[in-house]
């Protein structure tokens, strides 16, 4: 079982499903996710439903509650050998506790940013998962020092970047970027609410900067 609740986690879930299916062609994968995971062969019993901020959380509460109920029902009915929880901590912490109570092994994949805020969540993760696989090298030290089995597995996006030229000039040429001018990337986030609220502000800053520089 693979459980995630937002777009970025779903991308990791789809890539993971592809790799698992390549290693074990007969494997059966079920979970919570979106179209990418479905295309990767995961049988979905619930779609993803994430929120960002207080006002956005209100309309999604029912869908999150419904997703949790369906997940618990699937845990009881399917009794998966392994449950992989991808980020989405507030939801997945509850799923992990229930999965372990029912006898499934639990792997947490993609650590919440415990190094940035709410570091106490390390202890919570120790209770809901047996092991954790992290994307950033320094995260491994954090969990190992806390006594939790942990392995640095690298960031999946590097596999995608690996398809691009390593040379900066060649990359700029392929992307149609001026080699002599500074390059700024706008990264508003992966959630719909982030895109709707943050991207217009970022674009406004870019327009203002262009006018003043």
Task: Give names to the regions the model predicted.
Residues 1-175, 187-195:
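Active-site and donor-binding regions of nucleotide-sugar-utilizing enzymes
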Residues 178-185:
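Charged active-site motifs of nucleotide-sugar-dependent glycosyltransferases
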């Amino acid at each position: 079982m693979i459980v995630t609740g937002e777009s970025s986690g779903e991308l990791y879930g789809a890539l993971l499903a592809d790799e698992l299916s390549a290693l074990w062609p007969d494997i059966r994968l079920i979970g919570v996710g979106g179209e990418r995971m479905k295309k990767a062969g995961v049988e979905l019993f619930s779609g993803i439903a994430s929120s960002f901020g207080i006002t956005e959380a209100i309309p999604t509460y029912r869908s999150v509650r419904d997703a949790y109920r369906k997940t618990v029902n699937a845990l009881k009915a399917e009794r998966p050998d392994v449950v992989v929880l991808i980020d989405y901590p507030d939801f997945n912490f509850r799923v992990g506790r229930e999965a372990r109570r029912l006898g499934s092994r639990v792997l947490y994949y993609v650590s919440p940013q415990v190094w940035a805020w709410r570091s106490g969540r390390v202890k919570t993760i120790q209770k809901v998962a047996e092991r954790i696989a992290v994307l950033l090298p320094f995260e491994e030290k954090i969990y190992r020092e806390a006594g939790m089995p942990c392995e640095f597995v690298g960031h999946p996006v590097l596999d995608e970047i690996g398809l691009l030229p390593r040379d900066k000039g060649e990359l700029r040429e392929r992307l149609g970027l001026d080699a002599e001018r500074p390059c700024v990337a706008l990264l508003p986030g992966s959630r719909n609410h982030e895109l709707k609220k943050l991207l217009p502000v970022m674009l406004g800053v870019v327009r203002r900067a262009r006018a003043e520089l």
